[in-house]
């Protein structure tokens, strides 16, 4: 599988999450792909058919005015692609329904860069965390097929391989740090706690006097 917007496995969970899906007698048309990151919630700038691409963040916001159709996207990021990188008509990529944004308008981004965190803000159908990925030729144009950027086909299923980690419990390393200041010690403790080392009893700290 080509690199997409998530690291590891991804899923198209429902039929209505596919690009081009219609319902309501053809009155409602889905202009993007609803992609779930199974191994990571971090939304990243994708590749195009394994090719690295670059662009500029033009919008990173949430619209609350319901007269503006984009309120349905919730928190979203728009990236304008640099010119002449791909042979298709896509110039803008939208990453929608985010829980948290990691970029600001004006930021330069490239394939693999962190853009946002997957969520279900706005009018996210189904009540599950995902990213609505939309591709457009113009900022206000109709959605184009985003599958070459998605990292998976435009079909229901699970795609990709689970990312391997270096967390081999048979290979443990003893690390001694210090002496350090109280601020540095607190930072080390916070990191160890986030990695689960404190709860596992693998973190030890001693204060010296004098």
Which residue stretches match the model-derived regions?
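Acidic, glycine-rich catalytic/binding loops that coordinate metals and/or anionic ligands
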Residues: 1-4, 104-113, 130-171
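Polar, enzyme-active/binding microenvironments
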Residues: 5, 9, 13-15, 53, ...
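Short glycine/threonine/proline-enriched tight-turn/helix- or strand-capping micro-motif at secondary-structure
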Residues: 11-49
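Zn2+-dependent peptidoglycan hydrolase active-site motif and core
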Residues: 46-102, 124-132
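Active-site-proximal beta-strands of protease catalytic cores
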Residues: 54-58, 105-122
């Amino acid at each position: 599988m080509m690199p997409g917007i998530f690291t590891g496995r991804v899923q198209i969970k429902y039929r209505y999450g596919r690009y081009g899906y219609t319902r309501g007698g053809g009155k409602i048309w889905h202009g993007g792909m609803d992609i779930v990151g199974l191994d990571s919630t971090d939304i990243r700038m994708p590749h195009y058919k394994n090719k690295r691409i670059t662009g500029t963040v033009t919008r990173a916001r949430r619209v609350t005015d319901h007269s503006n159709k984009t309120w349905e996207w919730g928190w979203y990021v728009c990236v304008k692609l640099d010119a002449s990188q791909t042979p298709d008509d896509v110039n803008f990529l939208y990453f929608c329904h985010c829980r948290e944004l990691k970029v600001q308008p004006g930021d330069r981004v490239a394939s693999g860069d962190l853009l946002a965190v997957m969520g279900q803000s706005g009018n996210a159908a189904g009540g599950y965390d995902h990213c609505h990925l939309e591709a457009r030729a113009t900022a206000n144009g109709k959605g184009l097929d985003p599958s070459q950027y998605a990292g998976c086909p435009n079909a229901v299923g699970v795609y990709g391989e689970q990312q391997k980690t270096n967390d081999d419990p048979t290979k443990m390393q003893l690390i001694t740090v210090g002496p350090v200041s109280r601020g540095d010690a607190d930072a080390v403790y916070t990191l160890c706690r986030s990695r689960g080392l404190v709860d596992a009893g693998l973190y030890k700290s001693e204060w010296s006097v004098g």
